[in-house]
Curated annotation (Swiss-Prot):
Belongs to the eukaryotic release factor 1 family. GO terms for molecular function: sequence-specific mRNA binding; translation release factor activity, codon specific. The keyword Disulfide bond does not apply. It holds the Pfam family eRF1_1. Keywords: Cytoplasm, Protein biosynthesis. Its main location: cytoplasm. GO terms for cellular component: cytosol; translation release factor complex. One of its GO terms (biological process) is cytoplasmic translational termination. SUPFAM superfamilies: L30e-like, N-terminal domain of eukaryotic peptide chain release factor subunit 1, ERF1, Translational machinery components. This is Eukaryotic peptide chain release factor subunit 1.
Length: 441
């Protein structure tokens, strides 16, 4: 995979994480009355048309009997109209707006005003005024759009298919008439066997050529994985043949036995491959973390873990791939003294309850919290500035769990060897500046 592909995959993963986080926050929000507006505009729709609809809704809301609810709804509609004014046309992927007033856990009212362009086209139009935000259309954006190739091959022919999400597509079918194992007429057994093997060889070559035609674009595979299926040993022979494209051989994730050929075999192959299809991301995650562990086992010096060393690697431009547990709870604080002096500290959910960490030891002055942000979000917003790609991982695999428990859920693969111990001799930050204490994950 090229560096461009790596970057595109990293960017897509980060956008998915941002949407996932947004959905979580929106679903937790609740309001009084029906003052929470969910507005989703499809690509190609007209801003003027949506403005007209909001103006009509404003007129209707003016008749709400409850004064408190009426003012809340009118305020939310006005906020949505103001957000809409920021756009002269609907963005290429559509527009999602959430406006309203939510009630915090402390019972206080907090305004919510969000407008985003999704990372891929959203095919839903929605306007709802409720006591909650409606996020189902955003959730649909997170459904996998990975494509998987299927080759169903037996002695009667081959089918080339594609599966993307829940959509199956038959790309091409061929039929073949191979001689049976027994001879006919006066043909010698040896000559007949040679003829049969030649036709079989040509058949495998034809299927291999078509596989490259359908599943390779611009010299690289266009599918995330490839499944070979069939009722005889053709599928195994195809996958091991020298005629089968090496680039596609590396993409084979499963070989399955099916009772039929053609469309019925395609459907059966999809059913039998369900588990491996759902675990492709899981497999990619295991591979990435295993690579991280391998660097450590070989003591290459081309790895980092923990907040302090990872931030140093980023500052040096040495980090190639940043690996972050998506549920890491560490918070990044930007603090400022009345004198103007600033510093950054990182605290977990227990450490931030200690008021002493927000007080300067020398002067006794209290720090002002200028910025408070989950470190995961900070990485998502800033990883590009350091020339790194960002990979989110879970703790659901054995490797992922070990990465979170043993390495704090944060690490990286480096472009070149870095001696962090030597760097620390020259640069000893304040102990709070990169607070790298163990956390309860």
């Amino acid at each position: 995979m090229s560096a461009v592909d790596d970057q595109q995959n990293a960017d897509k993963q980060v956008e998915q994480w941002k949407i996932k986080k947004l959905i979580k926050n929106l679903e937790a929000a609740r309001g009084n009355g029906t003052s929470m507006i969910s507005l989703i505009i499809r690509p190609g729709d007209q801003i003027a048309k949506v403005n007209k609809m909001l103006a009509e809704e404003y007129g209707t809301a003016s008749n709400i009997k409850s004064r408190v609810n009426r003012l809340s709804v009118l305020g939310a509609i006005t906020s949505a109209q103001q957000r809409l004014k920021l756009y002269t046309k609907v963005p290429d992927n559509g527009l999602v707006i959430y406006c309203g007033t939510m009630v915090t856990d402390e019972g206080k009212e907090k305004p919510v005003r969000i407008d985003i362009e999704p990372f891929k086209p959203i095919n839903t139009s929605l306007y709802l005024c409720d006591n909650k935000f409606h996020t189902a259309p955003l959730g649909e954006l997170l459904e996998s759009d990975e494509k998987f190739g299927f080759i169903v091959v037996d002695g009667n022919g081959a089918l080339f298919g594609l599966l993307c999400g829940s959509t199956r597509t038959v790309l091409h079918k061929i039929t073949v008439d191979l001689p049976k194992k027994h001879g006919r007429g006066g043909q010698s057994a040896l000559r007949f066997a040679r003829l049969r093997m030649e036709k079989r060889h040509n058949y495998v070559r034809k299927v291999s050529e078509l596989a490259t035609q359908f599943y390779v674009t611009n010299d690289k595979p266009n599918v995330s994985g490839l499944i070979l299926a069939g009722s005889a040993d053709f599928k195994t022979e195809l996958g091991t043949s020298d005629m089968f494209d090496q680039r596609l051989r590396e993409k084979i994730i499963k070989i399955v036995d099916v009772s039929y050929g053609g469309d019925n075999g395609f459907n059966q192959a999809i059913e039998l491959s369900g588990e491996v299809l759902s675990s492709v991301k899981f497999i990619q995650e295991k591979k990435l973390i295993s690579q991280f562990f391998e660097e450590i086992a070989q003591d290459t010096g081309k790895y980092c873990f923990g907040i302090a060393d990872t931030l140093k690697a980023l500052d040096l431009g040495a980090a190639h791939t940043l690996i972050v547990w998506e549920s890491l709870e560490t918070i990044r604080y930007l603090l400022r003294l009345p004198t103007g002096e600033e510093k950054v500290i990182f605290l977990n959910k227990d450490q931030n309850k200690d008021a002493s960490v927000f007080k300067d030891k020398e002067s006794g002055l209290d720090y002002e919290i200028v910025e408070e942000m989950p470190i995961v979000e900070w990485f998502a917003n800033n990883y590009k500035n350091f020339g790194a790609s960002l990979e989110f991982v879970t703790n659901k695999s054995q490797e992922g769990s070990q990465f979170c428990k043993g390495f704090g859920g944060l690490g990286g693969l480096l472009r070149y060897q870095v001696d962090f111990a030597q760097l620390n001799d020259f640069d000893n930050p304040d102990e709070n500046e990169y607070d790298d204490s163990d956390s309860d994950f």
